[in-house]
């Protein structure tokens, strides 16, 4: 009898708890929905709301253009039935407050942390928040600062020269069509290998096979970018991750009969295995010192050597443990490779499309080289105005990441630079963001805003940086760790490697332009850059960017 009563009580108690949780969730959803219901936005097209449009590889850019044309810098995006709608934001003043004054009130959504923990480990920079994230940035900031980066140019030049040796062989008999997507992936991976982690990941020889990790990483990003994957990450992944151990979650993922899951799983496991192996080799070389370090491809000048030397192999209470250091290895490989590949390939494509800029840039760099003894110093590269303009304009118009999600941890009121008209017809000069609301910060939206940049905002025009910028840019209060663009974000979660990317890209482009000439092929009109977590060029559904290449 007592057992029956206890079971009956347990069932009733469980039911009561479930009802209370459901009631709390419904109340929270109604609270959020009611406070943002006056924000205009597109009507949902299905039970998924506008989610499939927002994350569509084929129609994503078209959807972005439509909502900007109709709703401006702020709109409400419908999500799957039963979920809270999100706020799409491209207003510079509101974004300024999100990234600066009110940055403590926002963080990455929970599902982003879960996804990054599965890919990068529980202790990677992208997977942490709060005090732990602040601690990591505090010791990582100097590693990405000028004092360490001054050792990078010789490493970057060495990679660039190997890449150009391959191009000279391929173009020895004259102009030929080359898939630059293939080579862009290889050279960007080797930049990370040489400068960031201190290993040769690709010899860049034309008769050598490319490192499979680069291709797997590209496929992994494409798989993670599909609407189905984004839905799973947002609404399913956090639930299973909170149920059991990581070992159980991996076992559960093995049961999912999906090619996308297989691609991502293989990519993650390859990343984890490579990172652990390379970390141990790096640590052993540091412990041996002397010849062991000089035998490494980077001669011990890479960023991970600095991190291990100063924060792992030390006798301090705040030392970094090996699991965290391995997570930082994975983070560098994961974050840097595809970002730099996207920027490199986009710049090359734009130079092919604008032969006048290509010629002017070649003349600027050759003039600087005439007075130099060997490779240009990084200080001289920084002083080249057109090179800087090409770099800034490319990353303004084509940021590697189109948008970033943040979730409000408390109610926030954000001022608007450009007031909007609510659904009820009232003018709104500020935005009320309820606790728990996801805000999609549109990097591409604010970088391309005609209200800020003028009527030619959608035109690639490096010359805009060679004259005083419009007053609308100066007065916009646009956030950004680099001047006037939001590509590398701002505040506590800005991109730590922005100087690294700038150095890498300027060195590579300066040498490429002096050695090679690029022109479009007959397939050029077919080159597309589908919407995704990061951006890569495709032709007829295959990752590719064919260009005519010849020696300059």
Swiss-Prot record:
Cofactor: heme
EC number: 1.-.-.-
InterPro entries cross-referenced by the UniProt entry: Cyt_P450, Cyt_P450_E_grp-IV, Cyt_P450_sf, Cytochrome_P450_monoxygenase
Inducing stimuli: Expression is induced under erinacine P-producing conditions.
GO molecular function per UniProt: heme binding; iron ion binding; monooxygenase activity; oxidoreductase activity, acting on paired donors, with incorporation or reduction of molecular oxygen
Localization, UniProt: Membrane
Family, as annotated: Belongs to the cytochrome P450 family.
Catalytic reactions of this protein: (-)-cyatha-3,12-diene + reduced [NADPH--hemoprotein reductase] + O2 = erinacol + oxidized [NADPH--hemoprotein reductase] + H2O + H(+)
Topology relative to the membrane: Single-pass membrane protein
Pathway(s) this gene product operates in, as recorded in its UniProt entry: Secondary metabolite biosynthesis
Gene: eriI
Organism: Hericium erinaceus
Name of the protein in its database record: Cytochrome P450 monooxyhenase eriI
Residue positions with a glycan: 50, 447
